[in-house]
């Protein structure tokens, strides 16, 4: 029997974990190991994926993946043991007893040396909140070279010569996701002086798996038990002193959200870093456990590779456990010769035979066995938390079989209505009024001062009009990210991925891709930016490439302009057809991408569903500031340059004389070269190609350009047939997004991908418009 067949509410014991490569390792790292008890919680509304409970936390996985996990001993779910309310157990302050700070007088690092810290932890454990408490307003966003995963660096408040780096949230140090590789590479290559490992105290078993792997890196380390206030409120506690003794590192109970225990955490972190007090325990395997097979294996590998590990500057215990798992990256770095590789495989095979488990499962089982012992000795189980009970009630509606999709549609409709119809639009209109007023004031001042006409035109027609039109979108983007951050931080976005995964998987994507593409209907720029949250590089790239096919709000003026001029009786029908046309083209391209550029092993949909929580006001505010600053820094500079270029081309002729008629400008000449390309589509007039070129700057400018060049709607209708108008609408729907969106794509994927988007979408738009014309001619339109 497999996990796929387990009825809802039933519990079973895992016997075999199937699969291979990244999929199987991901299962094991998430706690799906032989001899673990697993309970089926529910199915997604579409029947796939499923939610299961294992090691006291909830995970989601697809039915196809669940079918590779064999189970037996099916039984009714045991009722959780309830803890009794206890008082908080006191924790010794810095240096009390001297147990973990015995080097207080032994060779500290010089006061002038920079103390660097890596802040590491699982997703949804409060890491960002802790980082903000530690650094205040001193953080800034940077990038790892070659990897589009954000990190944050900041100085610990009140502590000079310190720098803490907030690493991506991960569940293990296995080299299968970009986040895991980034975190591991940072610690191994950048050599931080200390690690601050933040652990969700409400879910200790899940979090300690990463803790053990971090300890194996043999870097001075302190463990921050976050959300201890929630544990106490729900009747639980943690015997901190006993946990310190079991782990061999300082353990500090904190509440990052309430700023409790932060000063003590900082004191411990600085102390272990300054005196280089490394974890006292690196060995988690007992010689008496399961016949000592894993113990002998790991220690045998350590003796075998010790000199290679020292030469490669990799902690020997970490290298040994990774080799035992079958980590190819570590094997390559160590540079073992053939005899040593054969000896390594012999040691591992002997362990597998004695243990009765394969190498990866045996190592994962060893870790979870140790975690179980530590938790049994140190963790007093709380009552079922208020947050979990509340989440269960909310999930009955938000992930219910018949209510999930209507709720999702309603929530997203509300977000878009508030963003593009009420709050965002209102703020955008206010900013636009301010920009218009400022433009008029500057225009009058420059006229009064008799400023040179060329400079006057550059400032007013170029910079103010061009940059100002794009700057007015900032409130919409900030408002949209405000609502998205509320949904993300509350835990709802994880449910959206759970609900929509089956539908999106049919076109080669995962459920996580739904949000960026939905955002793309409002604006491509935040849609592309939102794709950063996707864990799979393949899915992230596909989502970014597909998002521009979702018709953004800036194209609405184009649709409204042409439908009013050519199809006034069928305006709504034409608009709906255009939106669905973009969706259909996106689906078609997803299928093509999945068969061509983005072949490969699908990333497993193994995801933890966090409890619903109210987002912190401070965190949301800081996120909005970061997004606003990010948009201005990335898009504003590109738009500024592009505005000046387009102004120059519109203002001068080939002899650099100021033109009085736009058809004599350099832009018109260039557009004249492009115009024949659109001849087969029915709109070969240079004025249309000019409008399309200016549309690259901002889609709204297509309408304003046509209005200026034609003078009236009647003149436009005389030149363009209804069929050609449909072809032009099709082209506008699908051709390259605006320069701000391309700048975002360049930021996320690089210049080659951005150029590919521009060229590829123009080609796709031309082909689609040509097919529309052929069909129109055939049906006599």
Segments (PLM) and residue ranges:
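Hydrophobic core segments of alpha-helical transmembrane domains in multi-pass membrane transport
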Residues: 407-418, 480-485, 563-565, 578-592, ...
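Conserved G1/Walker A P-loop phosphate-binding module
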Residues: 91-172
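Canonical P-loop GTPase G-domain recognition
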Residues: 231-286
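Conserved C-terminal guanine-recognition region of P-loop GTPase G domains, centered on the G4
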Residues: 159, 182-251, 558
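Extended, low-charge hydrophobic alpha-helical regions
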Residues: 354, 361-365, 381, 422-463, ...
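Extended helical scaffolds that flank P-loop GTPase cores
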Residues: 248, 275, 281-449, 658, ...
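Juxtamembrane inter-helical linkers in multi-pass membrane proteins
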Residues: 433, 437-441, 494-524, 599-623, ...
């Amino acid at each position: 029997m497999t996990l796929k067949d387990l009825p809802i509410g039933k519990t079973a014991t895992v016997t075999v974990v199937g699969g291979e490569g990244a999929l199987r390792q991901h299962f094991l790292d998430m706690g799906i190991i032989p001899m673990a008890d697993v309970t089926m919680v529910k199915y997604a509304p579409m029947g796939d994926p499923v939610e299961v409970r294992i090691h006291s936390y909830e995970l989601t996985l697809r039915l196809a993946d669940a079918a590779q996990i064999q189970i037996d001993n099916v039984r009714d779910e045991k009722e959780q043991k309830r803890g009794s309310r206890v008082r908080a157990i006191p924790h010794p302050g810095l240096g009390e007893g001297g147990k973990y700070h015995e080097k207080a007088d032994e060779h500290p690092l010089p006061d002038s040396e920079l103390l660097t810290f890596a802040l590491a932890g699982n997703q949804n454990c409060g890491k960002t909140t802790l980082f903000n408490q530690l650094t205040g307003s001193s953080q800034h966003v940077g990038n790892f070279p070659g990897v589009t995963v954000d990190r944050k660096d900041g100085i610990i408040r009140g502590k000079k010569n310190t720098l803490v780096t907030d690493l991506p949230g991960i569940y293990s140090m296995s080299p299968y996701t970009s986040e895991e590789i980034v975190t591991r590479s940072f610690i191994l290559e950048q050599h931080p002086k200390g690690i601050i490992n933040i652990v969700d105290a409400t879910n200790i078993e899940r979090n300690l798996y990463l803790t053990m792997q971090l300890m194996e890196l043999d870097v001075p380390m302190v463990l921050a038990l976050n959300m201890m206030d929630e544990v106490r409120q729900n009747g639980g506690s943690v015997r901190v002193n006993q946990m310190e003794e079991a782990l061999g590192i300082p353990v500090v109970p904190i509440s990052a959200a309430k700023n409790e225990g932060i000063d003590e955490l900082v004191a411990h972190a600085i102390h272990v870093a300054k005196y280089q007090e490394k974890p006292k325990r690196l060995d988690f395997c007992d010689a008496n456990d399961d016949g000592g097979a894993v113990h002998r294996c790991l220690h045998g590998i350590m003796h075998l590779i010790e000199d290679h590990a020292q030469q490669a500057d990799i902690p020997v215990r970490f290298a040994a456990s990774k080799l035992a798992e079958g980590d190819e990256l570590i094997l390559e770095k160590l540079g073992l010769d053939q005899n040593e590789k054969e000896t390594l495989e012999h040691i591992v095979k002997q362990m597998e035979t004695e243990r009765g488990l394969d190498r990866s499962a045996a190592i994962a089982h060893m870790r979870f066995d140790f975690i179980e012992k530590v938790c049994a000795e140190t963790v007093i189980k709380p009552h079922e938390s208020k947050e979990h009970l509340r989440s269960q009630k909310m999930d009955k509606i938000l992930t219910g079989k018949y209510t999930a999709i209507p709720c999702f549609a309603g929530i997203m409709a509300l977000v878009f209505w508030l963003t593009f119809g009420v709050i965002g639009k209102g703020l955008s209109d206010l900013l636009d009024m301010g920009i218009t007023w400022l433009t008029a004031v500057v225009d009058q001042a420059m006229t009064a001062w008799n400023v040179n006409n060329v400079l006057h035109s550059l400032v007013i027609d170029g910079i103010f009009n061009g940059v100002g039109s794009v700057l007015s979108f900032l409130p919409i983007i900030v408002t949209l990210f405000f609502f998205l951050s509320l949904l993300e931080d509350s835990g709802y976005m994880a449910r959206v991925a759970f609900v929509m995964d089956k539908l999106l998987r049919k076109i080669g994507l995962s459920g996580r891709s739904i949000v960026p593409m939905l955002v793309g209907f409002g604006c491509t720029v935040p849609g592309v930016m939102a794709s950063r949250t996707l864990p799979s590089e393949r899915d992230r790239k596909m989502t970014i490439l597909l998002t521009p096919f979702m018709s953004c709000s800036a194209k609405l003026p184009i649709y409204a302009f042409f439908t009013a001029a050519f199809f006034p009786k069928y305006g709504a029908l034409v608009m709906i057809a255009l939106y669905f046309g973009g969706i259909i083209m996106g689906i078609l391209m997803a299928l093509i991408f999945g068969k061509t550029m983005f072949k490969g092993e699908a990333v497993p949909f193994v995801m933890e569903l966090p409890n619903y929580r109210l987002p912190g006001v401070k965190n949301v505010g800081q996120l909005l500031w970061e997004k606003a600053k990010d948009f201005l820094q990335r898009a504003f500079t590109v738009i500024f340059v592009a505005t000046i270029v387009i102004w120059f081309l519109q203002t001068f002729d080939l002899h650099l004389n100021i033109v009085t008629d736009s058809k004599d400008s350099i832009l018109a000449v260039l557009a004249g070269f492009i115009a024949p390309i659109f001849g087969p589509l029915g709109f070969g007039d240079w004025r249309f190609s000019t409008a399309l070129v200016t549309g690259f700057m901002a889609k709204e400018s297509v309408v304003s350009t046509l209005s200026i060049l034609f003078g009236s709607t009647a003149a436009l209708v005389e030149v363009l047939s209804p069929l050609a108008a449909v072809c032009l609408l099709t082209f506008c729907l699908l051709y390259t997004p605006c320069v701000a969106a391309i700048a975002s794509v360049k930021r996320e994927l690089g210049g080659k991908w951005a150029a590919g988007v521009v060229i590829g979408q123009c080609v796709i738009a031309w082909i689609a418009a040509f097919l529309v014309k052929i069909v129109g001619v055939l049906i006599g339109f």
